[in-house]
Amino acid sequence: MLAISGMHKEETKLTIPNQVVREQLFAYILDTYHENDLTFDSYEKRKLASGLAYDGKWKPYFEYIAGCLHRYASQRDKQKGEYFVHGFTLAITAQNPFYRPVFEKDSQEGYVDLFLHPLLDIYKDISHSYIIELKYAKGKDSSERIEQLRRQAIEQAERYASSESVQKAISPTMLHKIIVVYRGMEMVVCEEL
């Protein structure tokens, strides 16, 4: 009931051949999703990953990670704190087909918390790469502590981005320096430098 109509951003583009089939499919899919309380999670995740790689839309991607972390973290996970936040972020970014996430990438200036290394050998038209500096504050930490971690993350991300090893790895993409600060399981800072 679908026809292949070309390619778009390394994906096969499928179209519905006519209006009658379109209405039948749409009604069937919508009814099925409502009856079974299903979500579009894998589709949305793929769309967010594509937006990150091709359009530089980083904020929705990290908001998605924060939402998943908040939704799926158990009490035991919350007790692990920083280790859980870092591990969860790495696990989600590892599912992104356009990047190889490198945790604590060594640069001449220290260790980048998370470097999203673009897979340019496979996806030649990716135009964005990312350094993510993650910071964690305990749930009871003050706003002053959050600001201190934010400034520390800015300093580190700027330093790492200028290193020779990072510059070689990102060519020819545009490097985004992202800082993320969590207070407990809540993302309180997410900004680009």
Task: Name the predicted role of every residue range.
Residues 1-155, 159-161, 191-193:
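Extended alpha-helical interface modules used as scaffolds for assembling large macromolecular complexes
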Residues 165-193:
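Domain-level recognition of nuclease-like catalytic cores that cleave nucleotide substrates
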